[in-house]
A protein has these predicted regions:
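Rhodanese-like catalytic fold shared by cysteine-dependent sulfurtransferases
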Residues: 1-8, 12-92
C-alpha cells in the first residue's frame, strides 16, 4: 500500500548510464524504447521521469502524456541534481 503511494521513478537513460548508478527503486526504460515499454507501466500511478540532466526526462514525460498517462512529472536537473542534493544512488 505504501509502495503504491510513492511515485514510480522512471529512469530513461541509456543502459550504461543505469549500470553506473541509479535511484534505488527506480524502473529503467531507455527513452528510445519507452513506446514499447508503456504496457509495463500503470497509467493511474504518479510517475516521475528522470535522466542525467533533465532534457531526456522532459521528452519521456511527453511520450507518457501523449499515451494517456495523467500524473507525470520530470525530475528537474535529473540525476545530477538528485546527487547534488545529497541523495544516494545504487549500482545493481
Amino acid at each position: 500500500e505504501l509502495a503504491e503511494a510513492q511515485p514510480l521513478l522512471l529512469d530513461v537513460r541509456e543502459v550504461h548510464e543505469w549500470e553506473a548508478g541509479h535511484i534505488q527503486g527506480a524502473v529503467h526504460v531507455p527513452l528510445g524504447k519507452l513506446d514499447e515499454g508503456l504496457a509495463d507501466l500503470d497509467p493511474a500511478r504518479e510517475i516521475v521521469v528522470y535522466c542525467a540532466g533533465g532534457a531526456r526526462s522532459i521528452d519521456g514525460s511527453y511520450v507518457l502524456k501523449r499515451a494517456g498517462f495523467g500524473n507525470v512529472r520530470s525530475l528537474a536537473g535529473g540525476l545530477a541534481a538528485w546527487q547534488g542534493a545529497g541523495n544516494e544512488t545504487i549500482i545493481s
